[in-house]
Amino acid sequence: MAAEAAGGKYRSTVSKSKDPSGLLISVIRTLSTSDDVEDRENEKGRLEEAYEKCDRDLDELIVQHYTELTTAIRTYQSITERITNSRNKIKQVKENLLSCKMLLHCKRDELRKLWIEGIEHKHVLNLLDEIENIKQVPQKLEQCMASKHYLSATDMLVSAVESLEGPLLQVEGLSDLRLELHSKKMNLHLVLIEELHRHLYIKSTSRVVQRNKEKGKMSSHGKDASPGPLIDVSNISTPRKFLDATQYSAAGSSSVREMNLQDIKEDLDCDPEENSTLFMGILIQGLARLKKIPETVKAIKERLEQELKQIVKRSTTQVADSAYQRGESLTVDNQPRLLLELLELLFDKFNAVASAHSIVLGYLQDSVGTQPTQQEEIKLYDMADVWVKIQDVLQMLLTEYLDMKNTRTASEPSAQLSYASTGREFAAFFAKKKPQRPKNSLFKFESSSHAISMSAYLREQRRELYSRSGELQGGPDDNLIEGGGTKFVCKPGARNITVIFHPLLRFIQEIEHALGLGPAKQCLLREFLTIYIKNIFLNQVLTEINKEIEGVTKTSDPLKILANADTMKVLGVQRPLLQSTIIVEKTVQDLMNLMHDLSAYSDQFLNMVCVKLQEYKDTCSTAYRGIVQSEEKLVISASWAKDDDISRLLKSLPNWTNMAQPKQLRPKREEEEDFIRAAFGKESEVLIGNLGDKLIPPQDILRDVSDLKALANMHESLEWLAGRTKSAFSSLSASQMLSPAQESHVNMDLPPVSEQIMQTLSELAKSFQDMADRCLLVLHLEVRVHCFHYLIPLAKEGNYAIVANVESMDYDPLVVKLNKDISAMEEAMSASLQQHKFQYIFEGLGHLISCILINGAQYFRRISESGIKKMCRNIFVLQQNLTNITMSREADLDFARQYYEMLYNTADELLNLVVDQGVKYTELEYIHALTLLHRSQTGVGDQTTQNTRLQRLKEIICEQAAIKQATKDKKITTV
């Protein structure tokens, strides 16, 4: 067991360590480092036991595998014998070869002679075959050219010319053929260059044309449901992807350009033009073999701009043809949408052309790379040259369509800002445009046999003409708009930029991406667009809106020009608006639309909005001052409206807040009439206290009703303008706060509006509302100032100590004038103001008149019974007039009438009346009544008696107040 353990130990050690010498060194080190003799003896014993065990295992293995071991030994012996035999045979072969060499050396001269003769005969046969083949070259060349297998034709022609000018140069019979083939070789590259240009500019765009035709068919199928443009602009925010070779190559050929030029092979069994990318590679390969690459590059450079112009011309005709087939007339309808359709088509085509050029340029670089000796001599163009020419052509196109040369007559109005002076056209400008419904014809001849055959014939003729020249003949050409020798799909004008700006900007971004321009550098087309908008378009827009606004604001009296009924109906307003306000609002709306159409210049348009609104605000302020200012002094109503305390008080009263809130939405108040009556009393108290007992001269009131009507129109107009501008600005600010996901669906690249501009716009809208409120306050106060103007002199200067006669039966002339003024103002206000504002002006007027008349009692020198009757008749006629205006009984004037009827009593009777009926008036009003009675009646005692009565009046009023308070406290306790 110990031996097996020792053997297992050493076997495991050997299996772990593949190096036996290392194991031996380890054992020796163990024996040498051990100081104990017994340990060394034990180690030695283990080694011996392991050795004996290994020897026994080896014997067992030999016994077990004896057959295999014997077979291996025999196989080894057989292999050794074969190797020995092979060595002997090789030695014999070497000896035989040496013998053959010696024999051949003896016959070398005869063999050399036979070999040379064989070569000569073979060469003669080759020349004869070559001559025979060359004679067939013209016929084969013609066949290859007809089938457009240009690479085979080029190889055949180059090879034939090289043979004719080389080995066969001395053959006289081939001189005519030599001249013919040489001439064809000199002209073949022109054919190849022409084919290359056809594929660069026509074939490359054919797929774009086909795609638009398919889209047109889809649009025509859905035309009955909702007619729309041929080019779908609903997804206009999606950037256009660059076209690659797969868009005009055959299916499955997307990796064609990944092949080198040398790897391109021509398949004689296929249509060579089926794969345009491969075909252009074949053309370049043929030109390279003709050594005409420099001429090819030169031709491409020289013809690039002209070919791009031809694409524009063909695309214009194509768009016109699409419109013609849809039944649209370009000469009747000015449709910038067709310009957008044209540009979208051109962008697709130019991208296709650029992709084709990139492929051709790659092939040219491959062809130059195979000729290192000429690499420095041949200077290729690059894609930057292509994009520069594309930008130049687009720039020329935009110059024409944007009318940068100002070919339109100066008298021709702008499409967007031409506000018609006639009412019907002016109203039509604001009317909602109804979608045009296609007119359904009653019957057609298109399904008749004659129509079908004629349509097929015409369609085939048009397709053939278009495939050859790329232009449509007849029909749509007559549909194009002529202009200075150029044909347009829509009328040239600066406003066309609004339709095409965003698509054009996206294409510019694609160009800059293709050119690898960083943010700091712009392409030429962007610079052109920026210069045009900043230096031309913005100034033109400003000139147009200035002309339109000045046309209605620079008149002698801009506040008298109102919009007509048609415009009011379209705008949905109930009262007339100033035409100047509508023009300004439409200008703001137009500028806001321009801000969205040309979002990159939103700040400029918003600044214009601020400037125009500020100018109109100044215009309105000037017109307002022209009405309310007389000899450098404001009329009283305007000065009161300007007073912060008075205006703040008036706006805090419930009748002002009720005016801004519909009646059904107002909060219900208990004893609302008493609440409003208290408000009227407060207003009357402030106005009477503010004026005092001064007489108002005629120049301090607005006597001309047309001025009041102008103020009313200004109020309605400015309030409408403030509401429209607030709505526009709030939608603008809301669009700036959208989430990015929402913003992508609402707006494209609309930069955030600065807080300063938004604040300015908000302040302007608020200033218009404030000005409108001030106009309404002036009207509200002016009616009341008229009452002061007529009623204060009635008491101060009127004679009411009259006897009963005919004169006493007449109304006071001042009351008649006041009634006349109130009626005139009512007529003007009812036509100019909305009903709730009209009510605001005249509600509470009876209370004020009542207060003025009651307060005027102190100014009468004396009053008789006839004077009291006349005064009551004055009050009655005023009450009757106000009732007709407000359509409610003016109970406050009953209060004034009862006050004067109270003067029928003597002073003592008046005191008893107060005791019996309670206190209806203020202590001061009772004092004025007692004082007037004391002045008017005889035998009422001296001043001492009068003072006693006044003292008694105070006591009565105090007693009545105490009784009233006690009753009130009792009610509270009961509750």
Curated annotation (Swiss-Prot):
Modified residues (Phosphothreonine): 238
N6-acetyllysine found at: 9
Compartment list: Midbody, Midbody ring; Cell projection; Cytoplasm, Cytoskeleton, Microtubule organizing center, Centrosome
Coiled-coil region list: 32-114
Keyword Phosphoprotein: yes
Residues modified to Phosphoserine: 32, 226, 469
Keyword set, alphabetical order: Acetylation, Cell projection, Coiled coil, Cytoplasm, Cytoskeleton, Exocytosis, Phosphoprotein, Protein transport, Transport
Chief localization: other
GO MF, one example: PDZ domain binding
GO process annotations (BP): chemical synaptic transmission; establishment of cell polarity; exocytosis; Golgi to plasma membrane transport; Golgi to transport vesicle transport; membrane biogenesis; oligodendrocyte differentiation; paraxial mesoderm formation
The keyword Membrane is annotated on this UniProt entry: no
Reported function: Component of the exocyst complex involved in the docking of exocytic vesicles with fusion sites on the plasma membrane.
Similarity remark: Belongs to the SEC8 family.
Descriptive protein name: Exocyst complex component 4
Taxonomic source organism: Rattus norvegicus (Rat)
